[in-house]
Amino acid sequence: MLLAIKDFFNSLLLKELFKGMALTGRYLFARKITVQFPEEKTPMSPRFRGLHALRRYPNGEERCIACKLCEAVCPALAISIESDVRNDGTRRTTRYDIDLTKCIFCGFCEEACPVDAIVETHILEYHGEKRGDLYFTKDMLLAVGDRYEPQIAAAKAADAKYR
């Protein structure tokens, strides 16, 4: 009976309402953490996984040896590779495709690659107007790698002590 009377007076005096308003008032004047994204950028982790790229050796030869480990380890089945044996007995890729609509950006392909051929860059701003625009071919991936090689090499060097 005493508890019922206490609850009645608490609800009559709107105690719960004022507790909620006090909580709201505390956060009303606090520092805002919202970032206006296109204009403002937040700091990016050095291990951020963005757009994929295929790398080349300094002599211009592509690094991928067509071992297909990245294709095998991809949980989303986003990578498809076809290879061919060259005259000197080494294998090279003839087709290397990544479907970014399937990719979950887990980084397993990058970890599995024995020659650091496939990497995930820090590029996060890319788009496609059609589904096919997010289907990256070998030439497109090599172009991304060629364009951003200095940044990729710097990120690899900075991360080398943790590998």
Curated annotation (Swiss-Prot):
Cofactor note: Binds 2 [4Fe-4S] clusters per subunit.
Binding site for [4Fe-4S] cluster 1: 64, 67, 70, 113
Membrane topology: Peripheral membrane protein
Coiled-coil annotated residue ranges, if any: none
GO cellular component: plasma membrane
InterPro entries: 4Fe4S_Fe-S-bd, 4Fe4S_Fe_S_CS, NADH_quinone_OxRdtase_chainI
Entry's EC annotation: 7.1.1.-
Top class in the EC scheme: translocase
Keyword Membrane appears in the UniProt entry: yes
Cofactors (names): [4Fe-4S] cluster
Chain ranges of the 4Fe-4S ferredoxin-type domain: 54-84, 94-123
Ligand binding ([4Fe-4S] cluster 2): 74, 103, 106, 109
Gene Ontology MF: a single term: iron ion binding
Recorded catalytic activity of this chain's protein: a quinone + NADH + 5 H(+)(in) = a quinol + NAD(+) + 4 H(+)(out)
GO BP: aerobic respiration
Compartments where located: Cell inner membrane
Record keywords: 4Fe-4S, Cell inner membrane, Cell membrane, Iron, Iron-sulfur, Membrane, Metal-binding, NAD, Quinone, Repeat, Translocase, Ubiquinone
Subunit structure, interactors included: NDH-1 is composed of 14 different subunits. Subunits NuoA, H, J, K, L, M, N constitute the membrane sector of the complex.
Family of this protein: Belongs to the complex I 23 kDa subunit family.
Family annotation (PANTHER family): NADH DEHYDROGENASE [UBIQUINONE] IRON-SULFUR PROTEIN 8, MITOCHONDRIAL (PTHR10849:SF20), NADH DEHYDROGENASE UBIQUINONE IRON-SULFUR PROTEIN 8, MITOCHONDRIAL (PTHR10849)
Function text: NDH-1 shuttles electrons from NADH, via FMN and iron-sulfur (Fe-S) centers, to quinones in the respiratory chain. The immediate electron acceptor for the enzyme in this species is believed to be ubiquinone. Couples the redox reaction to proton translocation (for every two electrons transferred, four hydrogen ions are translocated across the cytoplasmic membrane), and thus conserves the redox energy in a proton gradient.
Protein name: NADH-quinone oxidoreductase subunit I
